[in-house]
Amino acid sequence: MARKDMLTGKSALSGNSRSHALNATKRKWNLNLQKVKVMDENGNVFTIKVSARTLRTLKKQNVVVA
């Protein structure tokens, strides 16, 4: 499975790592993905991968199952 937030669709960012001499090498900034269980309106429980930022929002909306 891709390193992608299943709700927002966010994925890793790419860019350059810069040394002191400003040499550029490619690198990625990965998301802080967490597996959480969420409940829909019908009471069904699903396990999804979301970023830490999305997890904060879900907890605020009381969607996350403990």
UniProtKB/Swiss-Prot annotation:
Alphabetical keyword list: Ribonucleoprotein, Ribosomal protein
GO molecular function, one term: structural constituent of ribosome
SUPFAM superfamilies from the UniProt entry: L28p-like (SSF143800)
Bias (Polar residues): 11-22
Superkingdom in the source lineage: Bacteria
Gene Ontology CC: ribonucleoprotein complex; ribosome
Covalent S-S links between cysteines: none
Pfam families: Ribosomal_L28
Region (Disordered): 1-25
InterPro entries named in the record: Bacterial_rp_bL28, Ribosomal_bL28, Ribosomal_bL28/bL31-like_sf, Ribosomal_bL28_bact-type, Ribosomal_bL28_sf
Transmembrane segments: none
Biological process annotations from GO: translation
HAMAP family documented for this protein: Ribosomal_bL28
PANTHER family in UniProt: 50S RIBOSOMAL PROTEIN L28, LARGE RIBOSOMAL SUBUNIT PROTEIN BL28A
Membership in a protein family: Belongs to the bacterial ribosomal protein bL28 family.
Record's protein name: Large ribosomal subunit protein bL28
Organism: Mesoplasma florum (strain ATCC 33453 / NBRC 100688 / NCTC 11704 / L1)
